[in-house]
Structure formats: C-alpha cells, structure tokens
Amino acid sequence: MTMLKDPSSKYRAFPTINLPDRTWPSKTITSAPIWCSSDLRDGNQSLIEPMDAVKKLRFWKTLVAVGVKEIEASFPAASQTDFDFVRTLIEGGHIPDDTTIQVLTQAREDLIARTFESLRGAKKAIVHLYNATSPSFRRIVFNQDKAGVKEIAVNAAKLFVKYAAQQPETQWQFEYSPETFSATELEFAKEVCDAVVEVWNATPSNKVILNLPATVEVATPNIYADQIEWFCRNINRRDSVLISLHTHNDRGTGVAATELGLMAGADRVEGCLFGNGERTGNVDLVTVALNLYTQGVNPELDFSDIDGVRKVVEECNQIAVHPRHPYVGDLVHTAFSGSHQDAIRKGFAQQKADGLWEVPYLPIDPADIGRSYEAVIRVNSQSGKGGIAYLLEQEYGISLPRRMQIEFSQVVQRETDRLGLEMTAQQIHALLHSEYLQANTPYALVSHRLQEENGHSAVEVEVSSKGQGETNLSWRGKGNGALEALVAGLPVPVEIMDYNEHAIGAGTNAKAAAYIELRVNGERAVHGVGIDENITTASFKALFSALNRSLSEQQAKAA
C-alpha cells in the first residue's frame, strides 16, 4: 500500500472554530502556569517496561526537587503496584506540605472507591476523573449517545462527593477531563463540564480543575487555542474553575499548542519531563518552562542541573533523550558551522556578565542550566576560524590574530577532511604545536644574546641548521628593536607584515605567546607562533616558526 494521491478521500481536515473576535493572538505569557507532572502515570503507562517502585520513588523525588507542586502519581485502581506506590508516598512521608499528590480514575464506582481508599491519610489530594466525549468514541468505543456520556460523568462526580465525605481529614480537590476534548463538539464539552462542576459545587475558594486534553493532536495549535479561549469565555463559574491543558505531540506541535492555550486563558499545564508519553508523547514540561525562562518569565521550576534531571529520567524511563532535544540534548548548544562559531565567539567576547543575554545562536546561557561552555563549539570539516579560535582561547588561553585564524583554519580543515571526524580542543592544540611550534626545519633556535649599542639593538643568535647535515650557525644583526635586529642578521630577505603578543596565564606561571606574519623571498605571507617564559625568546621562536614554514613551502613548491 502506498500514500494516496488524493488523501482527502480518506482523511478530513479538522473544522475551524468560529471565533472572529479571538484575543489570544495579541496576548503574551507573563507568569508561570500551575505545573502538573504526569510522568508517573501517563508517562509510565507508555513505557515498554514500566517503572518499579524504586524507580518511581526516585522519579518522584526528582520532580519534588525541581519544584513541581502537583504530581499525578498513579492509577491506584489499575493494579496493586500502583495502589501500593500511593501508600508508600503517604506512609513514608514523601509528600512535602507544598506538594499535592494526584491520582486518576475512570467513572466506575468500584474504581472510584479503590482510588479514594489509596489516599487515606493524605493531607491533601487531587482526584482526577475522566471519560471520553468525542463523537468517534461515543459511536465506536462506547456506543453511547450524548446523554449517556453526560450521565456517566455526572454519576461519577456524585460518587466523588460521597467518598470524599468519608475521609474529611483530607483536603480534596477534584479534576475532570472530558477525554478527547479537542475532538469533541465545544458546546457538548461545555455541557458535560458544567454539569460536573455543578455537582462538585465549585467556588472561588474551592476550585475544580477542568482538564481539556488534546488526547490525540488532530489540528494546528491555533485551533486548540481557539477551543480554549471559547471554553474559558463560555464555561459557567469561570472564577471557580482552573482550566488545565493536557496536550500530546502527534502532529509535533504539543509545545506550541500549550503555549497558545496559555495565551488563550488556561491556568495549568499537565505533561511529562522531556515529552515522554503515549505515542509521540505528552507535552514536554521542560521545554515549555525554559521557553518561559528565555522570555524573562520565572517558570518556578528549577533546571539548574538539567543534565542531572535528564540522567534520572533516562534511567527510569529507559529511553534516551535525543541529542537535538530542546535545551537538554547533547548537541543543542553546539555549533559546528564556521559562521555560527564566529558569531558565537564574538557574542561571548561582548557579553557582559550582568547584561541581557545576546549571544547569537544560543537562546539560553548554557551555564544557567548547569551546562559548561566546553561543548558549545566543536570542530569538524564544516567549521571555520571562529570556532577554532574560540576553543584555543577558552581552553588554552591562546588568542590567534585574525589573519592567522584564517590560515590555521585551513590547516585544521585539511586534517578534519583527512580524518572524517570532528576534532577536540586537545587535538586542535596538538595540531597547532606540530604545525607551528615544532616547525624547526631548516633552522632551530638554540640560543640568543641581546644587547643595546648606541641606541640600537644588537642580536647574536645560534641556530641549528638541518640542511646538509646538522650544523650550528651564528648570525648577527642590528636594528631598532630585537626583531628588526634579528631580521637584519638572517641569510634570506624577510619582511615582517604583522606582530602580536599576549600573556598566557598570570603570576609566576605566566608565559608569553608571540605571533608573527612575514614574507620570505617575496613569497606569500605565512605565520609563526612562539611560546616561552621570556617575551623576546617567544618572539624569536615565532619568527623562526614562520621562516621555516615559508622555506619548507617554497622547497616543496620547487620540487
């Protein structure tokens, strides 16, 4: 079977919402929503191998540490394992006073009774009721009309009131989800929710949560936002309900749908860390939270150690986080492209510690979420001078002059092409050494003596010549400064084009780095590098580095 030439013969476009006066497009999100993690329930039920009690407790503690205040822990009536985990949390004192446990149940009395029993002794709890309301579920799955579906929800809501009254020591909050809300007629979803809220007698001081799931993502995010805005406008007792979002990622836009839903008036978000969940997953709470953070809004969740959180999630879920996953993937703060690296390097150079973050290509400062800058720039065959220069400067304190960056980047590119792999900072540093600092043929500096004579510098150098066998030579020269004097004593014509120097490190362990660009015998300009404790020695080493590289190049050209 192949894809259809005319998919409209099999698939229908989701209808748009008649909301010409929609206001959400002009809104911005200015505060964090209430966060509810469904990792231990929705996320866990989607795993090939569900978590055991040890992993669940580890995950629970991670969610608490991050700052999630409402955590859906299980479906207690589904299994003894789920029931026991709720009891472990309550009896083991694992629920902080500022955190609320949430559990889920279907609309059957035996399941509801078992669910409330699991929560006995809890200080406060959210009990979450759901039943599917969309036309396809009514027709295909349940064979119920609208009245029947509404009756199921209302009867279950009454049972919630009954069983909650039997445990008055617990502070209860009720939640209702018209499952498949985004595929349900809006008027009918409102009708069912109004009826449930009426049974629960919601008030501003005892709010009911109305969770509006995109159980399966069936439309573009703007349509979901229209549905949420319409619902917020039309639901009864709006001041007594919290509108909660529960999006999935079937079309790849779960985060966008959630953000637009918040703009449309929602108060709360249910989802999973890094987007685990059925099929393509629930909305990723981390991405939504850090999207807020990078817009200057405190998400009230702490991902200062995002890699530590990822480690727990990966080990508990036994699913690796994709290397391109927003904010947390191994490669999301990494630039291989030369132009990107150059922009990032310049951004870091100009970034003020207490200023607005404006580093190109990095929407968040990696340090804010516990990431180092070491992996921001990595070098492969697509990289340019900026990335190479950045790595040498950050890791080794070596600041290459601009024109030398261009020359050395070509050296690095030849090596990455040869290897077919990326190069680490250590490998790049080693290549710099072999190409420049170890360029000692045909002349290697052995020693030098510098003195002032009548306002001029006089230099005498001893070099080891590796031309026709190894011999030591002595050259003398005078000039206005040490380098000019050395050039005057060389046996070949040399023109210095550029010279730079800087310190590496500080204090007694500091060294001097010297960079020289020169032209030998009128040929093309080449660069040399010298590093030494003494700045004069470093500059002489740099000159011999460039001289040798040029002469070797000329010899190869003539061969």
Swiss-Prot record:
Subcellular location: Cytoplasm
Main localization of the protein described in the UniProt heading: cytoplasm
Domain of life: Bacteria
Keywords for this protein: Amino-acid biosynthesis, Branched-chain amino acid biosynthesis, Cytoplasm, Leucine biosynthesis, Magnesium, Metal-binding, Transferase
Record-linked Pfam families: HMGL-like (PF00682), IPMS_D2 (PF22615), LeuA_dimer (PF08502)
Gene3D superfamilies documented for this protein: 3.30.160.270, Aldolase class I
Region Regulatory domain, residue ranges: 439-559
Transferase keyword on record: yes
GO biological process: one example: L-leucine biosynthetic process
SUPFAM superfamilies: 2-isopropylmalate synthase LeuA, allosteric (dimerisation) domain (SSF110921), Aldolase (SSF51569), post-HMGL domain-like (SSF89000)
PANTHER family linked to this entry: 2-ISOPROPYLMALATE SYNTHASE, PTHR46911
Family according to the record: Belongs to the alpha-IPM synthase/homocitrate synthase family. LeuA type 2 subfamily.
Function, in words: Catalyzes the condensation of the acetyl group of acetyl-CoA with 3-methyl-2-oxobutanoate (2-ketoisovalerate) to form 3-carboxy-3-hydroxy-4-methylpentanoate (2-isopropylmalate).
Assembly information from the UniProt record: Homodimer.
Name of the protein: 2-isopropylmalate synthase
Organism, scientific name: Pseudomonas fluorescens (strain ATCC BAA-477 / NRRL B-23932 / Pf-5)
Organism placement in taxonomy: Bacteria, Pseudomonadati, Pseudomonadota, Gammaproteobacteria, Pseudomonadales
